[in-house]
Curated annotation (Swiss-Prot):
Involved in the regulation of the intracellular balance of NAD and NADP, and is a key enzyme in the biosynthesis of NADP. Catalyzes specifically the phosphorylation on 2'-hydroxyl of the adenosine moiety of NAD to yield NADP. The active site is at D74 (proton acceptor). This is NAD kinase. GO terms for molecular function: ATP binding; metal ion binding; NAD binding; NAD+ kinase activity. NAD(+) binds at D74, G75, R79, N149, E150, D179, T190, G191, Y192, S193, L194, S195, A214. The keyword Cytoplasm applies. The gene is nadK. SUPFAM superfamilies: NAD kinase/diacylglycerol kinase-like (SSF111331). Its cofactor is a divalent metal cation.
Length: 294
């Protein structure tokens, strides 16, 4: 069995998690291939001393891997998706962060859950990705032009609102006068969109969510649309540029550029461990049922 390992930041709280993962897989003769920057950081911290194979930080994995394990929070998983792309290699998130809707494996029961991996006692779920094209062409979106959580447009270098002219399948929807606009997948519905008043979608729902950020018109509410919709955006504002973010990757775009957003023809696979369901995660992370009056 060959497993890719990726992590982004090193904190003292992650040290026992990293040690447990490496000790477990080494004792079970699992071949680990580590993202090169993460491995260098582990060498610097003297957490590992053994030589390991690496994979580069700017390329995709091939399908020879059983899975990619992400050590960190949800942000780390979103970055890890860039290594997976359309390879079909599933992602497993081990939560060394805080909230963790995607990184569901908790450090308290890590040995049991890693044994599920060894025994291949897991399933996978598919997550929709959003692809982005920009006219005129923007170099920033040449390769990593997809998002697992959301595509967001927002104002830049100004406190003034922007206007986001929005079309669905070439039919005019609205011109949002707001701080920005979020186009979210079901996976991203528990992220930025949720904090702006958007609904929660279960991962298997075939829909997207359009959520305005602090709209001037309070009747501009979040909208759920079919996931086969092509969304076209044209942004104007007082500044010459605005910001476009694909999950955690952010770039400046010229006003009047045309953005086209639609789901990609491939999906990301997420590893689902027995007992760690989406509904259980919702209850635990959002503290549903904690009010004893219920």
């Amino acid at each position: 069995m060959k497993i890719a390992i990726y992590g982004q930041y090193y904190q003292n709280s992650t040290e026992p998690i990293i040690k447990d993962i490496f000790a477990f897989f080494n004792s079970n003769n699992v071949e680990m291939v580590i993202e090169e920057n993460f491995l260098n950081m582990l060498y610097e911290k003297q957490l590992v001393k053994k030589d390991y194979k690496t994979f580069p930080s700017n390329s995709a994995l091939d399908n020879s891997f059983e899975m990619l394990i992400s050590i960190g929070g949800d942000g780390t998983i979103l970055r890890a998706a860039a290594f997976v792309r359309n390879s079909g290699v599933p992602l497993l998130g081990i939560n060394a962060g805080r909230l963790g809707f995607l990184a569901k494996v908790q450090k308290e029961n890590i040995d049991i859950l890693l044994q599920y991996v060894i025994n291949q006692n897991y399933t996978t779920s598919e997550r929709t990705l959003l692809g982005l094209t920009c006219e005129p062409f923007n170099e920033a979106f040449k390769e990593l032009n997809f998002a697992m959580n959301e595509v967001t447009v927002s104002r830049k270098d100004t406190t003034s609102m922007i206007t986001v002219e929005t079309y669905l399948n070439n039919e005019y929807l609205n011109s949002y006068w707001a701080d920005g606009l979020i186009i979210s997948t079901p996976t991203g519905s528990t992220g930025y969109s949720l904090s702006c008043g958007g609904p929660i979608l279960t991962p298997d729902v075939k829909s997207l969510v359009i959520t305005p950020i602090a709209p001037h018109n309070l009747t501009a509410r979040p909208l759920v649309i079919p996931d086969d919709t092509e969304i076209t955006l044209r942004v104007t504002g007082r500044e010459d540029q605005y910001l476009v973010s694909l999950d955690s990757r952010i770039s400046s775009v010229q006003n009047e550029s045309v953005l086209k957003i639609k789901k990609t023809d491939y999906k990301i696979k997420m590893v689902e461990i027995p007992g760690e369901t989406f509904l259980k995660t919702l209850r635990n992370k959002l503290l549903w049922g904690e009010d004893k009056r219920n």
